[in-house]
């Protein structure tokens, strides 16, 4: 952000400082909560399921959200190309599944099963905790690149649902964070 400010002769310091303060505040809020639910991101593409490495931006955001990320111990800073079988063996007990897609209409569980029947082995598929963001209608990439605090807030809310028994003691604090901005719960 500061780099773009220098390119266009704008002062980006105050905006960067505000974003950093918001991020650190949200990180502190998440740290006070019990560890969140387990989260799996993305979905199968062809014969590969790409997931963020444990040291990737998304991996760090999930850690800062105090979520349990399946690949949090991984040392890669980029994407991991895994077979669906590897994902299912490591992540079959996942609580929350959050992914991005480009489509114009919400994906249904039936459509996901047409894409890959193995999804039904995921705990979060059987006990639906599926969240999706349609990048054709939401400015996800445009905003989250410069506003990581928005994505951190999303991951806190996804991994600490206020209506979950584990977090009922903290429901008031969680609800103060507001509603999800990008991710929408899949209802079908």
Predicted regions span which residues?
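Structured C-terminal subdomain patch of bacterial secreted/periplasmic proteins
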Residues: 1-11, 18, 99-188
């Amino acid at each position: 952000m500061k780099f773009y400010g220098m390119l266009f002769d704008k002062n980006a310091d105050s905006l960067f400082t505000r974003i950093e303060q918001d991020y650190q505040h949200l990180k502190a809020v998440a740290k006070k909560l019990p560890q969140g639910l387990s989260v799996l991101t993305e979905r199968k593409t062809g014969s590969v399921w790409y997931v963020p490495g444990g040291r990737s931006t998304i991996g760090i955001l999930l850690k800062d959200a105090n979520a349990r990320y399946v690949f949090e111990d991984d040392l890669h800073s980029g994407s991991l190309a895994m077979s669906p079988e590897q994902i299912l063996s490591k992540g079959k007990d996942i609580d929350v599944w959050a992914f991005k897609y480009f489509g114009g209409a919400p994906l249904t569980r039936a459509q996901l099963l047409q894409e890959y029947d193995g999804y039904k082995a995921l705990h979060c598929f059987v006990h639906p905790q599926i969240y999706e963001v349609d990048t054709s209608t939401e400015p996800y990439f445009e905003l989250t690149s410069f506003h990581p605090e928005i994505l951190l807030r999303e991951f806190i809310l996804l991994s600490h649902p206020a209506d979950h028994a584990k977090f009922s003691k903290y429901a008031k604090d969680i609800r103060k964070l507001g509603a999800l901005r990008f991710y929408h719960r899949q209802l079908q």
